[in-house]
A protein has these predicted regions:
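Membrane-embedded segments
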Residues: 50-108
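An N-terminal hydrophobic leader/cap segment in hydrolases
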Residues: 4, 8-48
Length: 108
């Protein structure tokens, strides 16, 4: 009986250790490769910060001048290349769309 309990305890300890060591990848899954957003009428701008880091921004102007532009900051598991459908939705509604890629994500 003690042998079975020991094996279960060892397996549980191994599972806990694996979860602890891989917690950053479990909580903050990063994309494998940054995908450049492709959308008609969109502008992808590359800005180099004073620190030397590169930041990208996606701008889709509104259909009519003077219309509202939505500023969007994506979540941890997203990147600019995945925001094209969202940008299209706002564009169809007559709104502009502006999003910035966080340093270390996607294209940056």
């Amino acid at each position: 009986m003690l042998g079975v309990v020991g094996v279960v305890a060892l397996a549980f300890a191994a599972l806990c250790l694996t979860a602890w060591l891989g917690q950053r990848r479990l909580l903050f899954p990063a994309s494998k490769l940054g995908e450049e957003p492709r959308m008609e009428g969109a502008t992808l701008t590359k800005v180099t910060a004073p620190s030397g880091r590169t930041v990208y921004a996606l701008h889709v102007p509104p259909k009519k001048q003077g219309s509202v532009t939505i500023v969007h900051f994506h979540g941890n598991a997203e990147e600019l290349g995945q925001l094209t459908p969202l940008a299209w939705s706002f564009r169809r509604a007559g709104l502009g769309f502006f999003a910035v890629e966080y340093p270390g994500y996607g294209l940056a």
